[in-house]
Amino acid sequence: MFGSKEKEPQSSEGEVTPSNGSKTDLETGETGGLHRTLHSRHLQFLAIGGTIGTGLFLGSGKAIATSGPVGCLIAFVFVGSILFSVMTALCEMATYIPVPGAFTTYASRFIDPTLGFAMGWLYWFCWAITFALELTAAGLIIQYWNSDLSIAIFISVFWALFTALNFMPIHIFGELEMWFASIKVVTIAGFIVFAVCVNAGVGQQGYLGFDYWLHPGPFNASIVEGSAGKFVGFWSVLITAGFSYQGAELVGIGAGEIKDPEKSVPSAVRWTFWGIFGLFVSTVFFIGIIVPSDDPSLMLDSQDASASPLVIAAKLAGVKVLPDIINAVLLTAVLSAANSNVYSGSRILVSLANERCAPQFMTWTNKFGTPYMAVATTSAVGLLAYMNLSANGGVVFDWFLNVTAVAGFISWACINLCHIRFMDALGAQNIPRSSLPYTAPLQPYLSWYGLFFNVLIILTNGFAAFIDWSTSDFFTAYVSVILFIVLLVGHKLFNRTMPVKAVDADVTTGSLRATS
């Protein structure tokens, strides 16, 4: 029954054609109006642009101060291994069923419509709130040059700019995001070269080698003293590492708009993961050997260049011109991330609407294939950035960081679970995995590995609130979990959905490999 490998028919204009062979009218804004005009390079840089941002350029400094250079490095490698399990699992599903929104659809089809509903809305909330976070960060970064300017000006300007950009045809959007992301990649590559030179003795510190791994030391204790404190320090920065990596899974979000997904999605996933993993681990490693973890500047609450470990490294080396350059790059980084935030959030809304978990008008598209109602709704949440005008910017930044980071781990856990159920469905329906365009390695063990540690990090991320009880810290750590549970329970009570049996799971609709 599932032996045919013929691809799903597509129109000459490249629009997504449903598996039943019908084609929707792009002008009417009906479901299926998204265009397959993205190339693999667009998908790669879309994910890179959404990933490399404030988490790496700002959050990594505080992470090194908390856990020490080696503790932070191990944390980034460890979370990177979890991300690998997530991305390979997502790649297998997205290559076989390349639909807009990807994993929220998979949750509804393979596990339970309730999970798809809760996962989709939480993930949308995550990216919509992150858009507000990046707008706030952009204003704070510009204040580095002129603190008298109100960030409200820049929130307004950038909100209007990125809302407009996301109404453009997707291939133009993809090209713009590619150039945005390229600036960040070049910056990190340049910093690595700079760090090698500084470590070798070019700067005023002289030859460093691994001195900072010895003094003040490779690990820092947090909350408690001794070995237990060092482990606590390591575990406490996993959320920061997760926030930094969050966005790499965007290659799955764009699967419904990419040309030739059977080849393009695996290529995009491969280059995206190894590119992001290599850049992140290298950056954290080199920061750890040229900046001492006890440098007080690492713990600054500022969101401009003064708090960036890249700038701190330059100051320690005696390079005075670099802070302005890094601040400009930071601005580019957060603006690029903001651009992809609106894209990813809007496509999740389209996926939710296709699964009847959101109003159907979210699927309306214009002649360019842009889901304009979904874009407008996601962009509107960015206006919450104005809340920063009445509170300390650092407090807002930290609160949003924790909320979005935990929501990201929840999404990763759900992706792993979706893949496990996807493999169960294939087995129950006698579809050999060897017939898929791409098969994830080390399965099912790798997906179980990712699921276990994602859940463990989610449950333990707020442990500090229990050691020295703090209601605000508890709420910050678990508000995403609470919201997720409320969405699950609410949808289940109102809709009375039943878990999907493996033999009944829909593994054909939207598949580019037509059934026979």
Q: Where in the sequence are the language-model features?
A:
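Membrane-interface "cap" regions at the ends of multi-pass membrane proteins
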Residues: 1-61, 65-70, 83-88, 497-516
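Helix-loop-helix junctions that connect adjacent transmembrane segments
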Residues: 19, 33-34, 146, 150, ...
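Extracellular loop-to-transmembrane helix junctions
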Residues: 45, 56-147, 151-154, 480
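Membrane-helix boundary/coupling elements in multi-pass transport proteins
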Residues: 99, 122-136, 240-258, 320-360, ...
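Helix-loop-helix connectors at the membrane interface of multi-pass transporters/channels
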Residues: 104-109, 135-155, 252-262, 267-274, ...
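TM-loop-TM module centered on a large, flexible mid-protein loop between adjacent transmembrane helices
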Residues: 105-107, 112, 144, 218-225, ...
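Membrane-interface loop-to-helix entry segments
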Residues: 152-215, 246, 269-273, 401-414, ...
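C-terminal membrane-solvent junction of multi-pass transporters and transport-like membrane proteins
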Residues: 362-369, 412-477, 501-515
